[in-house]
C-alpha cells in the first residue's frame, strides 16, 4: 500500500465537464503532512509510515507526545495517522507528504467520521416505511412488530430499532481525483465524503482500482 495523507473537508461544489454536465465535487484541504515515524520490520515487525497534520497549542500535548514529535521536527501536530506500506525505502523522517502525491484521474479511498444525527427513529435511521397517516391509524412512525412473544421472549441482537445515528467511521471507496492544486494544498474529488465541513479526513490511493477512472 502507498502512503496516504490527512486533510480537512472544506465543503462541496460542482464542476462542469466537457459535455456540460454538472459533476458534484468535494474540496479537501490535504496536507502538508510531516512524516513523524518510520516503522521497519527489523525494529517494529512491519513496515509503516506515520504522518502528522494540523497545528495544536503546546499545552494540549503531553510530554510523551512532545518527545515523539520532536524527533521529526520542531512543530507540534494535532493528528497522527499510520499507513501500512510494502517498503519504507526512500522515506525520510521529517519529510513532507503533499497533494503532489496524487494526480487527476487517480482513484482514492476517503475515510472519516459521518455526521452525527443524535437519537433517531426507525424511518430516518433505517429507512423503514411509515404507517398510514389517516383513516384512524395510530401507527404513523412506530416500528411494528419487534419479534415473537413468550418464545424467544427477548429481542434478538442486531434488531433494527431507534437509537444513535451517525458519528461512526466510514470509508468511501473509489472516488476520482478531478483536480490537484499544489499552491493551496487542495484536492478536488468527485462525489461526497464523510463528515461536515471542517471534519478530519484520511485520503489514500484506492485499494481496489478496477478500470481506468474517467472524470
Swiss-Prot record:
Highest taxon above the source species: Bacteria
Residue ranges of the region described as Disordered: 124-164
PROSITE patterns (UniProt xref): RIBOSOMAL_L3
Disulfide pairings: none
Keywords associated with the record: Ribonucleoprotein, Ribosomal protein, RNA-binding, rRNA-binding
GO terms classed as biological process: translation
Pfam families with a match to the protein in the record: Ribosomal_L3
A single GO molecular function term of this UniProt record: structural constituent of ribosome
UniProt GO cellular component terms: cytosolic large ribosomal subunit
Record-linked HAMAP family: Ribosomal_uL3_B
Quaternary state and interactors: Part of the 50S ribosomal subunit. Forms a cluster with proteins L14 and L19.
Role description: One of the primary rRNA binding proteins, it binds directly near the 3'-end of the 23S rRNA, where it nucleates assembly of the 50S subunit.
NCBIfam families reported for this sequence: L3_bact (TIGR03625)
Family designation: Belongs to the universal ribosomal protein uL3 family.
Name of the protein this chain belongs to: Large ribosomal subunit protein uL3
Provenance organism: Synechococcus sp. (strain RCC307)
Species classification: Bacteria, Bacillati, Cyanobacteriota, Cyanophyceae, Synechococcales
Gene: rplC
Amino acid at each position: 500500500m502507498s502512503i496516504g495523507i490527512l486533510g480537512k473537508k472544506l465543503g462541496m461544489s460542482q464542476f462542469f465537464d466537457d459535455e456540460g454536465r454538472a459533476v458534484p465535487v468535494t474540496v479537501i484541504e490535504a496536507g502538508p503532512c510531516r512524516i513523524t515515524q518510520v516503522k521497519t520490520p527489523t525494529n517494529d515487525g512491519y513496515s509503516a509510515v506515520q504522518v502528522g497534520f494540523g497545528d495544536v497549542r503546546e499545552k494540549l500535548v503531553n510530554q510523551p507526545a512532545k518527545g515523539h514529535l520532536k524527533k521529526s521536527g520542531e512543530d507540534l501536530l494535532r493528528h497522527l495517522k499510520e499507513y501500512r506500506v510494502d517498503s519504507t525505502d526512500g522515506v525520510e523522517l521529517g519529510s513532507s507528504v503533499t497533494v503532489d502525491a496524487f494526480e487527476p484521474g487517480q482513484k482514492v479511498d476517503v475515510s472519516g467520521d459521518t455526521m452525527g444525527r443524535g437519537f433517531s427513529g426507525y424511518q430516518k435511521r433505517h429507512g423503514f416505511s411509515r404507517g398510514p397517516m389517516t383513516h384512524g391509524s395510530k401507527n404513523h412512525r412506530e416500528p411494528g412488530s419487534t419479534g415473537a412473544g413468550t418464545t424467544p421472549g427477548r429481542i434478538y441482537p442486531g434488531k433494527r430499532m431507534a437509537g444513535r445515528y451517525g458519528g461512526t467511521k466510514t470509508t468511501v471507496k473509489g472516488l476520482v481525483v478531478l483536480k490537484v492544486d499544489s499552491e493551496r494544498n487542495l484536492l478536488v474529488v468527485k462525489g461526497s465524503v464523510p463528515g461536515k465541513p471542517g471534519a478530519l479526513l484520511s485520503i489514500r490511493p484506492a485499494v481496489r482500482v478496477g478500470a481506468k477512472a474517467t472524470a
